[in-house]
From Swiss-Prot:
Gene Ontology molecular functions: metal ion binding; transferase activity
Family: Belongs to the LTA synthase family.
GO cellular component: a single term: extracellular region
Entry keyword annotation includes Metal-binding: yes
Protein location: Cell membrane
Membrane topology type: Multi-pass membrane protein
Lineage, top ranks: Bacteria, Bacillati, Bacillota, Bacilli, Bacillales
Associated pathway: Cell wall biogenesis; lipoteichoic acid biosynthesis
Extracellular domain ranges by topology: 31-42, 91-118, 173-649
Protein name from the UniProt record: Lipoteichoic acid synthase 2
């Protein structure tokens, strides 16, 4: 071996391999919570970077003598960058970067700078120091391998494949069917590593994209039979109770349920929302869970309006905007509803300008319609108070009945508020992100109260059903130490993390008697619930969700990674808990019927989305959406007409 290395000048290459290998392992241990349970998993975590280090750096050996070391350094840097990008991404999302997420950067990347920067640390220089060491070695030693290195490459390539196959075989013995049944990226990284996961993800992405081309009308039959068999008959007490009313959705950015009725220094953080939760004209759902994947806010929007699950990788908004959809706004067109979305950000963020056309949304009031001055904006766009204030004339200009959606932004990570925007005290839990969360949540609460008052003033309150929901978690698992203090616990366990995925859901309609609803439900359940309240039966539509107010409502809530929660079981990170007690259960104690249901639910939804199957299915009375009918370009007359309407009033 020594002779082989010396003769072929492979010392530089092997140094690069060892540096990348060890650095990657250190990165795993310091940054990722992968749930290592046994010695086999510990060994695999250490070994799995080796095969990919050999494989990718080995391509540098194919270059000619003068370029060889340069190629190895460039590949080493790119792999280091991929590792570091995953580390930064994981610090907030507790997830790993996928190919679709990289594609999302085209629409979102330019506006994510502040959030990404806040996640970086001075010690992160560690992940690039070894690249600098390699550059110095190349300059000082400058002794690349021999000119003809194809034989060396073949040996290195074969070695990397052998290491990978051994790695995979051991992983499969510990986690059978790892590559075929795992929705959870944590498992894939734990057993195979970030670099091998990226290859796996690329293959899955190609496979997903090919499903549309191969699909035909016969594929929709299985899905139709399954979803119609699981249709929930509406509750006669509530069906049609809000018929003819305007619909106003409000996305409550990053709001989690623990904040409701929570106090800081004796002061309620969200006094208006607290009051609303206990109002007799509000349906407040205290066991409602977000089910978002990597698309976060856009996933929540998609589920609310289409009652289908998000993608396993990436955002439906970004990757499937060409699909045929049967969204709530499109369904309500048969009832003469006009639809509009209000958002104090650019049209292209999350590819909304294209997705809304597929959903049949008539108007999109984006940042072009608002006064986006420095005082009114922060981070992702317009602050909530000026956003709602400036939205009112636009809302009043719409013909009624209308279906509208307002997307708030101020309560967004890292939750800092400008001076003068709030006098509410920050928390004192030793974590700036958690501490600031209470201030921005209070600001959001004040903006919602202002919005309700404006609706009453303009006569729209009594004519509308108002649906408000937390779009996704705000505080990630990286802040569990502070969150334990917030909740008065010694520590936050995996079970606790699952419970913290609760987000508030309010359905408020003046004149309609509400109640506190304890049923377990998720994002996909909202569309059928609202449509039934409006008097629209969903039996002919293909929806994953279940009317929460129905007596037949299903209370098993799938998460995108295959975990789930129900009144009986909580499955998180592959472990089962008793939902009522939090006690961990042995798999032998668990009725796996809920597991099977979750797998089937995700499978059916994925078939619809990846195969674009709704193009083959048209319910009676539904007019298929033609995206080319919609144009969200702001014209001068839009502003002048709104101004004229306000003057007339």
């Amino acid at each position: 071996m020594k002779t082989f290395i010396k003769e072929r000048g492979l010392a530089f290459f092997l140094i690069a391999v060892v540096l990348l290998w060890i650095k990657t392992y250190v990165g795993y241990v310091l940054n990722f919570n992968l749930g290592i349970d046994n010695t086999i998993q510990k060994i695999l975590l250490f070994v799995n970077p080796l095969s990919s280090s050999l494989f990718f750096l080995g391509f540098g050996l194919l270059f000619k003598k003068k370029l060889q070391q340069t190629a190895i350094i460039v590949i080493h840097f790119l792999m280091s960058f991929l590792l570091y990008a995953n580390i930064v991404y994981y610090r907030f999302f507790n997830d790993f970067i996928t190919i679709p997420v990289i594609m999302q950067a085209k629409t979102n990347g330019g506006q994510l700078g502040d959030s990404a920067f806040s996640l970086m640390r001075p010690t992160d220089a560690f992940y690039f120091i070894d690249t600098i060491i390699l550059i110095i070695l190349a300059i000082k030693v400058n002794k690349p391998a021999e000119t003809s290195s194809k034989k060396s490459f073949r040996i290195i390539f074969a070695s990397s494949i052998l290491v990978f196959l051994i790695n995979l075989a051991v992983a499969e013995s510990d986690r059978p069917e790892l590559l075929t049944r795992s929705f959870d990226r944590n498992y894939l990284v734990k057993y195979l590593g970030t670099y091998n996961f990226t290859i796996y993800d690329a293959v899955q992405n190609i496979k997903s994209n090919s499903q549309r081309a191969l699909a035909d009308s016969s594929d929709v039959t299985e899905v139709e039979n399954y979803m119609k068999a699981n249709y929930d008959v509406p509750n006669n007490v509530y069906f049609g109770k809000a018929e003819g009313k305007n619909v106003i959705y409000v996305s409550l950015e990053s709001l989690q349920s623990f904040i409701i009725d929570y106090k800081i220094d004796g002061k309620e953080v969200t006094p208006f929302l607290n009051k609303l939760a206990h109002d007799n004209e509000t349906f407040y759902f205290d066991n409602f869970f977000h089910q978002t994947g990597q698309g976060k806010t856009s996933d929540a929007e998609f589920m609310m309006e289409n009652s289908l699950y998000p993608l396993a990788q990436g955002s439906v908004f970004v990757n499937k905007a060409q699909n045929t959809l049967q969204s709530v706004p499109a369904i309500l067109k048969s009832k003469n509803y006009t639809s509009a979305t209000f958002h104090g950000n650019t049209q292209t963020f999350w590819n909304r300008n294209e997705m809304y056309k597929a959903e049949g949304i008539d108007k999109f009031f984006d940042s072009a319609y608002y006064d986006m001055n420095e005082e009114n904006t922060k981070n992702y766009g317009m602050k909530d108070k000026p956003f709602f204030k400036e939205s009112m004339p636009l809302l009043e200009s719409l013909p009624q009945p209308f279906y509208t959606k307002f997307i708030t932004l101020s309560n967004h990570f890292p939750f800092g508020m400008d001076e003068g925007d709030t006098d509410f005290p920050a928390g004192d839990f030793g974590d700036s992100v958690v501490d600031n969360y209470f201030q921005s949540a209070h600001y959001l609460d004040q903006s919602i109260e202002q919005f309700f008052n404006d609706l009453k003033k303009d006569g729209l309150y009594d004519k509308s059903i108002i649906v408000m929901y937390g779009d996704h978690y705000g505080i990630s698992e990286n802040h569990n130490k502070a969150m334990a203090k917030v909740l008065g616990k010694d520590e936050i366990t995996d079970y606790d993390n699952a419970q913290l995925q609760r987000v508030p859901l309010f359905i408020h309609a003046a004149g309609v008697k509400g109640e506190k609803v304890h049923k377990y439900a998720g994002d996909v359940d909202v569309a059928p619930t609202i449509l039934h309240l409006l008097g629209v039966d969903t039996k002919d539509y293909l929806m994953s969700g279940s009317d929460i107010l129905s007596k037949e409502h299903r209370e098993v809530i799938p998460f995108r990674n295959g975990d789930f929660i129900s009144p009986k079981y909580t499955k998180i990170s592959g472990k089962y808990y008793d939902t009522k007690t939090g006690k961990e259960l042995d798999e032998s104690e668990v009725d796996k019927s809920e597991d099977s249901l979750v797998k089937k639910e995700l499978e059916m939804s994925d078939k619809i989305i990846n195969g674009d199957l709704l193009r083959f299915y048209e319910p009676k009375g539904f007019k298929k959406v033609n995206p080319s009918d919609y144009d969200y370009t702001k014209h001068d007359e839009d502003s002048s007409e709104t101004s004229k309407d306000n003057e007339d009033k």
